[in-house]
Amino acid sequence: MPTYTKLTAMGQYVPGRVVDNDELAAIMDTSDEWIQAHTGIKTRHYAMNDENTSDLATQVAQQLLQKSGLAASAIDLILVTTITPDALTPATACLVQANIGADNAFAFDLSAACAGFTFGLATADKFIRSGQYQNVMVISAEVNSKMMDFQDRTAAVFFGDGAGGALLQATDNPDENSLIAEKLESQGNATVIHSGRVRPITEVAATNYPQTDAFYQVGRDVFQFATTVVPEQMRGLIASAQLTPSDLQYVICHQANLRIIEKIAANLALPMTKFPHNVDHYGNTSSAGVAMALANVFDTLTGPVLLTAFGGGLAYGSVLIKK
């Protein structure tokens, strides 16, 4: 008998420290007016010095257990998507597993930058459809603030910290299947390589690429990609499911920049009321943004929802779901 994947619970968490635009304007060449005009962002949340990615992810995992009524021992897999892990090793997912006492679960991290939640959902779906795993957590968590160069306004004003996640469960009822279709892609030739957080781990990386421990992005290129290539992927996936954009209850995009979301909405000829967003309050929380926005509207879902995200790699993915 075939096994299907049902999305049964969502959770989200942001750390308590709120940073508004004026606070950033006090330490870099920017202003509240400039940030809001170019990004739509008003505030973002930053983790405390002793608060790590695993701490945020653990908060979400505990919410998923509470909402589902499952014991931690019932979890088979914990998959954490992040580009700000607590360490290179062990996986942040392993720390979450220990924190919640999910002794029967195996755990690993997935790195697909801001596309992590869509890649994570698609990956978890395959584990469940194998018939061997019943209860899977996919948690996207980031502490981007610890990776910022606060002299670089082209990056620092965008990012915030947060976590969101989903509980996926096996079902033999095809009517309960939540993951309808997916399209995941990468363009490695568009990658900007730098040594980043791992520092120059090879002589080639140390010699040939820009040296920085902070995030680095080419904003104009990302904007162009996100507003042209990504909508093409979205349209193709919608058509493959024999739907039209107007059939969607919601479209939840990567929370990179409100202006990008507005351009995608115009491209699909859909009103912004169909685009739940949190970027204005939380900033770009990387892979967590889509999960957090979905968590906000999860209890209201009655129709199909398109999730789409894009990030470094370039990695980009769209997943069509229903509750």
From Swiss-Prot:
GO terms for cellular component: cytoplasm. The active site is at residues 114, 254, 284. InterPro entries: ACP_syn_III_C (IPR013747), ACP_syn_III_N (IPR013751), FabH (IPR004655), Thiolase-like (IPR016039). Signal peptide: none annotated. The keyword Transferase applies. It holds the Pfam family ACP_syn_III_C. GO terms for molecular function: 3-oxoacyl-[acyl-carrier-protein] synthase activity; beta-ketoacyl-acyl-carrier-protein synthase III activity. Keywords: Acyltransferase, Cytoplasm, Fatty acid biosynthesis, Fatty acid metabolism, Lipid biosynthesis, Lipid metabolism, Multifunctional enzyme, Transferase. It catalyses: malonyl-[ACP] + acetyl-CoA + H(+) = 3-oxobutanoyl-[ACP] + CO2 + CoA. Its EC number is 2.3.1.180. HAMAP family: FabH. Homodimer. The last Arg residue of the ACP-binding site is essential for the weak association between ACP/AcpP and FabH. Belongs to the thiolase-like superfamily. FabH family. This is Beta-ketoacyl-[acyl-carrier-protein] synthase III 1. It comes from Lactiplantibacillus plantarum (strain ATCC BAA-793 / NCIMB 8826 / WCFS1). The lineage of its organism: Bacteria, Bacillati, Bacillota, Bacilli, Lactobacillales.
